[in-house]
């Protein structure tokens, strides 16, 4: 038994460090790449080639969702629409085409596994971490598009990952920072949250990612990532999934707060997880500590060695499958939706449409919330598309000064994300509205207030579509 075989750490840098190369030669199961590992397509391919040269069975993964969450385009903003826009467009062929384009780019970069799609049903509009990463609020629609996304990306030889099992959509907390609880009963969970996972499994999804959430109706004692009833019971025995169960990053507080990553790794394996994503920055000493904790747990009987061996074999099987097809040509990639189609999915109030029809200068104002850990600090919306804001306001800014940046006679265009979740943003919007004509744009998941235009995404492509609607 080699504990390294089930570990998938992250690191910082554009080239493979010597210590990580040695871990790969020693049998490390995979490497998870993040924005800190991506400088250019050529550099990324050289990095993945180096990883595979050190261990041909290593699974190279990346968080590329084709929208707000993008590692390939973290520096410039994503050219893809994102799941919420695709759900509103509700054309499964368009969703499959976007996923195929994502898959083709990942295959060219030497990536084996994309940690996508997000198949959560966004049941709570206050959700701080899912939102526009979801295909929507209707389980049947989310299921259709989840299956299409899986089919599209896997047709290019890149494995997909349906996440976050058994459903992270009905939470008002971010599991990067806390341990959320989904209080729904079992009947609701089966009717609302599970259909997209079932559809993904039917589409042949290679992997499923766990969520660091409590679901008392399924397991009152442990988070899903550590839960035998949820992973071995519901996912394996109940739904019949035989692929690789991947954990969400174990450095997230929802998994490791109060126990540490090594203990979280042991619990995840015991629960039924196979490939353990450790996080974005895992130094050699930490990898060693996790491997030692797994070995010690097997030695003292608190972790079944057969369970670790089973997990390692599932990871190796995934690695072998990719090693055999890495040189295969990708399938043809169809055209994907453009700005015009994206613009058609926007919600635009009658008042905003009338204001935008007037021939007058625009003053763009930017509301900049603290960035979501999953999304990262990526360029977004019209600002990724080249718009210069007359003023930018964050949580500690002065709303009056923000409003004063609008020139006389201009139409104020206030652009933010999830405006309804931020009292400081609502105060700023009120201040700008108080000085004159204003159009408020929400590029996140809109609430029932403070949005004249709702775009349901903030990728660079969605920003281009917004520019076409509003003009300069």
Each predicted region: which residue ranges?
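Preference for extracellular/luminal or secreted protein segments
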Residues: 1-26, 258-472
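A substrate-binding/cap region within the structured catalytic cores of diverse enzymes
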Residues: 89-111, 118-134, 146, 150
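Short beta-strand elements of ligand-binding domains
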Residues: 60-64, 115, 438-446
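Acidic (Asp/Glu)-rich catalytic clusters
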Residues: 21-27, 48-55, 155, 201-202, ...
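A charged helix-plus-loop insertion that forms the helical arch/lid used to bind
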Residues: 76-91, 134-136
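Second-shell residues forming the walls of enzyme active-site clefts
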Residues: 10, 36-56, 60, 68-71, ...
